[in-house]
Amino acid sequence: VARNIVGTQSTFFGGVSPLFRGKGHDILGPAVTLQYAPQRPDLMPTGEYAKVGDQNHRIAVNITEEGYVLVVQADGNTRSGVLGGNMLLALQQNRKAAGLVVHGVIRDYAEAATQDFPIWTQDSKTTTDYDSQHDIAPLAVNGRISIAGNTVMPGDWIRADDDGVCFF
């Protein structure tokens, strides 16, 4: 039924699963989208903590309202973690966001494990010791993104549980 609504062959995000299985996280909410792209000096020229208010990943977190799901296109990159950490995840929790879905990995896995926030990712953590955004940069907020071969628009409904993630 869902694929008939959105007009696509599949509404399942293959390869994206709960970061912390067995916690009983079960969410449904509209999407806020965040797109990452390969890093270029002009995308984030002065470092991660410069001009904090202008950074797209922070803007996306700040506009994710109660009940919404932040959906992140990181093109399956497992070398650079996106979001994560106690500050950005705590902000999501305080805003009562429904959850986080990342086609890639988050950063600060150990800190994220201490928070009871629903997260779905491609893998549990980065494949390098350096887990910040060194390969990719946040490019756009609330635009059309692609997750595991599916186009996701802001406002599309996201459903996620221990079995995985789908949209409609």
Please annotate each region the language model reported.
Residues 1-153, 168:
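Feature captures the catalytic cores and cofactor-binding loops of soluble hydro-lyases/lyases
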Residues 157-168:
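A hydrophobic, small-residue-rich beta->alpha segment in the mid-to-C-terminal subdomain
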